[in-house]
Amino acid sequence: KVTIRNAFRYKKRMVMMLLGIGGCTALMVTGLGIRDSVAHILDYQYDEIMLYDASATYDSDSADSVEEFLDDRSGGYITGYQDTMTVSSGSGEKDANVIALNAQESEGYFDLHDSKEEIPYPTGYEAVVSSKLASQLGVSAGDRIFLNFDGDSVGYTVTGVCDNFVNHYVYISEESVSDDAPNAAYIMQGEQEDIQATAAGLRAIDGVSYVSVIEQERALMENSMSSMDYIVVVVVLFAGALAFVVLYNLTNINIIERM
């Protein structure tokens, strides 16, 4: 009763209490907000954007062997060109994963969209850029970017900025890199197919440099992000302890004054 009476009686006391509790609450909300903001990142990335189950990159000379192996499965696949290269604009440059696919074949394997609408897969010398990369390069739809193909700078017009939560990506058309043979495959798991066995079979082919199974990649990232839970717990505990200290001190002051 004394604490409540003094809070309403003395404006400074009320301000102290409100600021103290408000600050503690803000700290707690921040901690929980951080956790909530990253909780669904992997779901968005691998359930709504990248829809395939595995991918492989290989030397172009091994393309026939890889496709022959994949043809013997029940699941589907598409091939394209993928490489890490420098992407530049008038505002700077960044390294990014560049993926070149046939626009029609990409459906069902990649879903390019922003928060408002679907973004058509680019054709000709068009490009769709992932959101974080676009922000860092200072580009938006209608701007020009340049990709460095082994020393040759090739210009593309940005037709869209898509949502993306893991790494940087630039999507371009297969026809714009027609001189480069396919060096990547994106694979859908067939009915009753063991995707791990498929991955092992791909790794056994000469010239295959990397095989990624989305399930494994997702598990690794979930494990690395689990440390965020400990940070949230620490922040919430400190916020609660600080709120207790604030209320305890204010109550003590009020009781002492009453005595």
Regions found by a protein language model. Name each.
Residues 1-19:
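Feature of multi-pass inner-membrane transport and sensor proteins
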Residues 49, 121, 161-196, 215:
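Small-residue transmembrane helix packing/gating motifs
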Residues 34, 38-47, 201-248, 253-257:
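Peri-transmembrane interface segments
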Residues 66-73, 197-206:
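Short amphipathic alpha-helices in soluble, non-transmembrane regions
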Residues 15, 25-52, 64, 252:
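Alpha-helical transmembrane segments
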Residues 44-48, 68, 72-76, 80-144, ...:
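Short beta-strand boundary microenvironments
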Residues 5-10, 119-121, 224-225:
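Helix-boundary and loop/linker segments of multi-pass membrane transporters
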